[in-house]
A protein has these predicted regions:
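Active-site acidic-Proline motif in GNAT/NAT acetyltransferases
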Residues: 97-102, 106, 122, 135-136
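Conserved catalytic-core motifs of GNAT/GCN5-like acyltransferases
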Residues: 82, 130-132, 150-167
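A beta-strand edge to alpha-helix "cap/lid" segment located at domain peripheries
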Residues: 122, 127-128
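Conserved hydrophobic/aromatic "anchor" residues
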Residues: 15, 119-121, 149
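Conserved acetyl-CoA-binding loop-helix of GNAT-fold acetyltransferases
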Residues: 105-119, 138-146
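Amphipathic alpha-helical recognition patches that constitute DNA-binding helices
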Residues: 11, 22, 41, 94, ...
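GNAT-family acyltransferases
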Residues: 1-102, 165-198
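Positions that flank functional sites
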Residues: 42, 136, 159
Length: 198
């Protein structure tokens, strides 16, 4: 399974054992990515998920994990999980991204998040996709805005990292926003969002 958008330099696809090797060789550390570091990874955990098939989402699932590929190689991953608001089972898809250090700062993260937003709206029934990031992570906030998500506010003290609770900037896009952006785009170039206005 692969998923991309016309003109995008990245694609999303299922994990392979080779991808596990790449990611195991490039773990998040306090020095390389303090916003994604939550301690040492469990050795072999991703390999076990790939071998069991657990790492391969099916269309329609509101949880999953896919590789981000650019120029034919694994450069990171995207993941998503359901987030319910209230007692009705009508979840939002909350997503995140992790890129290896050599892939950062090249626009791949923004492109991967655009592709993922499109994938989630095209393959699930969610009415909303969202992502949050540390209020100090300015690069990811810009990336989410470029991917078409709108900043909705700050969720105070929601994220435990580096021995303390941190504030998170919350971004989201609803299905009506997404469909309006698609309708406004040309027939030959499909985009997943629009620049957030301030």
């Amino acid at each position: 399974m692969t998923y991309t958008l016309p003109g995008s330099p990245v694609l999303l696809r299922h994990f392979t054992l080779d991808d596990c090797t790449v990611l195991e060789a490039n773990p998040a550390t306090m020095d390389s990515d303090r916003f994604s570091f939550f301690g040492l990874p469990v050795p072999g955990r991703m390999r076990r998920r790939v071998e069991s098939g657990e790492a391969h989402p099916k269309p329609g699932e509101v949880h999953g994990l896919l590789v981000v590929e650019a120029e034919g190689v694994c450069i990171g991953f995207v993941s998503w999980h359901p987030q319910n608001y209230g007692p009705i089972n009508a979840p939002t898809a909350n997503f995140g991204i992790g890129l290896i250090p050599s892939a950062r700062g090249k626009g791949y993260g923004t492109e991967a998040q655009k592709v993922l937003v499109d994938y989630l709206f095209q393959t699930t029934t969610v009415n909303r996709v969202e992502a949050s990031t540390d209020v100090e992570n300015i690069a990811e906030q810009r990336s989410l805005e470029k991917a078409g998500l709108l900043r909705e506010g700050v969720v105070r003290g929601a994220h435990y990292r580096e021995g303390r609770y941190n504030d998170m900037a919350l971004y989201a896009l609803t299905r009506p926003d997404y469909e309006q952006a698609r309708a406004a785009s040309s027939a030959t170039k499909i985009t997943t969002g629009f620049s957030a206005s301030r």
